[in-house]
A protein has these predicted regions:
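Gly/Pro-rich hinge or "lid" segments in bacterial periplasmic/extracellular proteins
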Residues: 74, 141, 146, 150-152, ...
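Extracytoplasmic/peripheral linker and loop segments enriched in polar/acidic and small residues
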Residues: 92, 356-357, 407-424, 444-512, ...
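Alpha-helical secondary-structure segments
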Residues: 108-115, 160-166, 170, 208-209, ...
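Extracellular/periplasmic solute-recognition and catalytic clefts
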Residues: 213-224, 241-300, 323
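Ligand/substrate-recognition segments at binding pockets and active sites
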Residues: 217, 360, 364-437, 478, ...
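Structural transition elements
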Residues: 331-369, 387-392
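Long beta-strand-rich cores associated with HINT superfamily self-processing modules
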Residues: 508-537
Length: 537
């Protein structure tokens, strides 16, 4: 407002100028600073070393890819101002002339070549290396298994402003995949100078709307506006702080005390109704392309027996968990992929129509066939990462499995970073998990279950499933692709690879002083450049 008012009064007399000065001073009293709870300490700020939502929430503001998602979840130009394609296979991206790194140097096509090659390089060890393969970028699969060098990846700088990407198959939704954290560029010179320490505030060079200012591990990350960002004139928040509060109860209590402006996206049931009554206008509940489920270690005995996995799946009362315990608008999940995703709307599996008692009896019969009974009950550990809500749900789930199918379940708690490591290493039986879409299309979920996917911590391996997703790529239209996705989802259910529980909502508290949040993006990105602090009336 101050800039607009100042320009409109140029040429007026001293009194007008004095009036504007006083108005500007009043406006400046509104500090454009914001505090957001991010729910956990991040594992890293290197986009090629992370896989979780807390990390993406921060990196989203520090680095910008070829495109980003707007307030409605649509892909819009980021570093790339335009693009074209030939049969959805060869893509040409034209970069902005004014796209710059936070040190003032230009962002070029070669930066994306370097970054994507780094992502594909097995030496990087990225948990998201398979994303390039899922996007069907030429030679990505061979590079990931060491058969070809990273330089063979199908990405090429035609000149400083034009990037060519070649795919092995047509991918109509390829552009929508490019806003993902792993596809953002990293600064080659910063990495060469500082190695793994390039993400420290004193070394960080980014190209996003904000730059890393301070990082106190297990406490806070502070970012400030990047004056070199191409659209900096439309950013209003000057400084943002991300807190690492894992306790949802502490999160809401600190929100109520005024310390936090935007809470994390999960409100504990014990406080949800209280917030509905006390502050209904500050409570935002929106659909979220995220599935809460229990992950089963498919390669570990006895869970390599599909009868055991199906019994665990059928023995959980997901309806009670969803509608009575959490009860914030979540939808009961009978499959992995949310039914409201683009090209979704999947048919429910047959067991979804069984009564609870019918499901439990079927589960007991399966366990009996697998050699389990009252004298020899199924025993397993349930791993969950630190969180009040995760703990409560784990206690409830363990109780249900004991009551409904006679299983003996012990609880195992680990911090976020440690739990991720345990799951990747296969050091678990059953684990609490949430998978959130990387883009709005069923493959954002289904690809995770591919046998060679680097995110596949269930260790599910079915060549027939892999073949279905390969077949979907050559489907002639969205309707044909949807039918194949339905078959893939049905196969996941038949194999009982996971225990789906519910499709999440984003439930968060937002102070009335914060504007710019619309909540229409089902990916629920925490994009600070959209926000601003209201001026007092």
């Amino acid at each position: 407002m101050r800039d607009r008012m100042f320009k409109s009064t140029l040429g007026f007399g001293v009194l007008s100028l004095l009036f504007v000065t006083l108005q500007a001073s009043a406006t400046e009293k509104v500090k454009q600073v914001i505090t957001i709870n991010n729910g956990s300490e991040v594992t890293s700020l290197d986009p090629h070393k992370v896989e979780g939502v807390p990390e993406s929430n921060v990196i989203l503001n520090l680095l910008e890819g070829l495109v980003y998602t707007d307030v409605d979840g649509k892909s819009v130009p980021g570093v790339a101002k335009s693009w074209s394609n030939e049969n959805f296979t060869t893509w040409i991206f034209t970069l902005r002339d004014d796209a710059k790194w936070s040190d003032g140097s230009p962002v070029t096509a070669e930066d994306f070549v370097y970054s994507w090659q780094r992502l594909s390089d097995p030496n990087t060890g990225s948990p998201y290396s398979s994303y390039l393969q899922n996007a069907y970028i030429l030679n990505a699969g061979a590079i990931l298994v060491g058969k070809m060098p990273a330089t063979a990846l199908g990405v090429k700088a035609l000149d400083t402003q034009h990037l060519q990407v070649t795919l092995s198959h047509p991918v109509p939704y390829f552009v929508d995949m490019l806003s993902h954290t792993s596809m953002k560029p990293v600064n080659k010179s910063a990495i060469q100078r500082h190695g793994d320490k390039w993400t420290q505030p004193q070394n960080f060079i980014g190209n996003g709307a904000y730059v890393l200012d301070n990082w106190v591990v297990n406490e806070r990350i502070v970012v400030k506006r990047n004056p070199f960002y191409w659209d900096n004139q439309n950013s209003r928040i000057e400084q943002a702080t991300f807190l690492a509060i894992s306790s949802e109860v502490s999160d809401i209590n600190r929100y109520r005390s005024g310390e936090i402006d935007i809470s994390n996206s999960a409100i504990p049931p014990v406080l949800y109704k209280k917030m509905q009554q006390e502050r209904p206008n500050e409570l935002y509940v929106r659909p979220y392309l995220c599935t809460f489920y229990y992950e089963i270690n498919n390669q570990k005995a006895p869970f390599n027996d599909p009868r055991v996995r199906e019994a665990i799946k059928l023995g959980l009362d997901r309806e009670t968990i969803t509608n009575k315990i959490i009860a914030q608008g979540q939808k009961v999940a009978y499959g992995f992929t949310p039914t409201f995703i683009n090209n979704g709307n999947f048919t429910l599996p047959n067991w979804a129509n069984l009564s609870a008692e019918q499901r439990y009896q079927r589960a007991k019969d399966l366990l009996s066939q697998a050699g389990y009974n009252k004298e020899n009950p199924l025993k397993f550990a349930l791993l969950y990462n630190t969180s009040d809500q995760n703990k409560q749900q784990a206690i409830v789930a363990a109780s249900m499995w004991q009551k409904n199918i006679g299983a003996q379940v012990t609880l195992q708690n680990q911090e976020w970073k440690t739990s991720l490591q345990s799951r990747h290493e296969g050091n678990y039986d059953v684990a609490r998990a949430t998978w959130c879409a990387d883009y709005n299309e069923p493959t954002a979920f289904l690809n995770m279950m591919l046998s060679q996917n680097s995110n596949n911590t269930t260790f599910y391996n079915n060549p027939a499933f892999d073949a279905l997703l390969e077949k979907a790529l050559i489907a002639p239209d969205p309707s044909s692709r949807h039918k194949i996705y339905q078959q893939a989802e049905a196969l996941l259910d038949k194999d009982s690879a996971i225990v789906p529980v519910y499709y999440r909502v984003s439930a968060r508290m937002i102070k009335p002083s914060v504007s710019g949040f619309k909540g229409n993006d089902p990916l629920d990105y925490a994009d600070i450049k959209r926000l601003y602090i209201n001026e007092p009336n």
